């Protein structure tokens, strides 16, 4: 059994998040997704570094996942896996599904350089496969990949040629900059308007 673990800031979730979830559903038996605080974020909230509260981000991600589940029921939210430390999330997944499954940790290309600074990274990396998605504005440096390998990591790069259409060149940060509603799913757009988020 192959299980993908996808903790995301979801600040807000975009059509790129939707595309990633669909790709994962097509390649894994189970996709576990949750909204998480990223300790490296530098947003306006001094406590979390994010733009929207964790509660709002969880609600928006739930709306996105409910939309994806119409076609891919194996994509499910597991908020109890959420932790600022990926190793803790993995350990909680192992408590839920056991040690037998092959676990993959889903990350964006923007995180590759940060991973070596993560909590207990030498324990984390040998226990999972990293599935790395391209991100607009972030190249993938072979030296950074080599460093991951030295730390015991093994990874899969989502093909940036054949799969480019699967991950559109948009991101939460691009949405926050230009406020283009075409970048986010309709249910998320309605929630943002209702809650008056991202107005600054």
Curated annotation (Swiss-Prot):
Pathway membership: Cofactor biosynthesis; NAD(+) biosynthesis; deamido-NAD(+) from nicotinate D-ribonucleotide: step 1/1
- What GO terms are given for molecular function? ATP binding; nicotinamide-nucleotide adenylyltransferase activity; nicotinate-nucleotide adenylyltransferase activity
What InterPro entries does this protein map onto? Cyt_trans-like, NadD/NMNAT, Rossmann-like_a/b/a_fold
Q: What is this protein called?
A: Probable nicotinate-nucleotide adenylyltransferase
**One example of a Gene Ontology biological process annotation:** NAD biosynthetic process
Keyword Lyase in annotation: no
Question: Which reaction does this enzyme catalyse, per its entry?
Answer: nicotinate beta-D-ribonucleotide + ATP + H(+) = deamido-NAD(+) + diphosphate
* Keywords on record: ATP-binding, NAD, Nucleotide-binding, Nucleotidyltransferase, Pyridine nucleotide biosynthesis, Transferase
Look at the named UniProt entry and state the broad enzyme category this protein falls under.
Answer: transferase
What superkingdom does the record give? Bacteria
Which SUPFAM superfamilies has this protein been placed in?
Nucleotidylyl transferase
Q: What is its EC number?
A: 2.7.7.18
Q: Matching CDD domains, A to Z?
A: NMNAT
Q: What does this protein do?
A: Catalyzes the reversible adenylation of nicotinate mononucleotide (NaMN) to nicotinic acid adenine dinucleotide (NaAD).
Give the protein family.
Belongs to the NadD family.
Which organism encodes this protein? Synechocystis sp. (strain ATCC 27184 / PCC 6803 / Kazusa)
Q: Which PANTHER family match?
A: NICOTINATE-NUCLEOTIDE ADENYLYLTRANSFERASE-RELATED, PHOSPHOPANTETHEINE ADENYLYLTRANSFERASE
